[in-house]
Amino acid sequence: VSDNEVIFYEELNYGGASHPYKLGDDINLGNTSLNDKFTSVKVGAKVKVVAWQHYDQTGVYREWDVDQPDITDIGGLTRFRVVKSGTLPIAVRLEDLTGQEKHHYSMKVDSHDVGTAKVYSGGAGYGLVGLMPEAGPPVTTAIYVRDEKSGVYVATGSIYFTWDGETKSIRIDNAENFPKNMEHQRERRNEFTCQLKSVS
């Protein structure tokens, strides 16, 4: 595999039919014969693959920057991009601080970059909401937090993600557009927890 390409395979351990993709490819395999067919991948030295579940909007994602003999843990590959190795996926999860049961609230995040992701309160996983190359540009997403029982939206706003050159990580910048009844904290270089504090 060359430095700027990846090769997906239809069988584990790099077996079966191979399918090469290059840096910059933004692939949606939905409605094609290759949807959910890839089970292993070889990755060039200067790129990585960011893959995510697309049609059920979970935003569950994986990033692969080295060869992977088994990628089936993503639960079927439909959407992926081949990006420079320094690119970071941006991901969020929802934490409910109001005391409701697990999955009482959902947070839908709309992004021009990767589409829509939906995460639920109490869920352990992060949903992919964007991609940021080293040094930017910024990524803006719209967020909608909904009470799944009543259907009422309890928080709406936007998140403005920017590159922090000092820490080589992503940060949230737009306090004025972030919902007033929520807080956020960075868990890792690129993963954030959005906390719902109240619904009044």
Name each region found by the language model.
Residues 1-113, 120-128, 132, 136-156, ...:
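Compact beta-sheet-dominated domain cores in extracellular/mature segments
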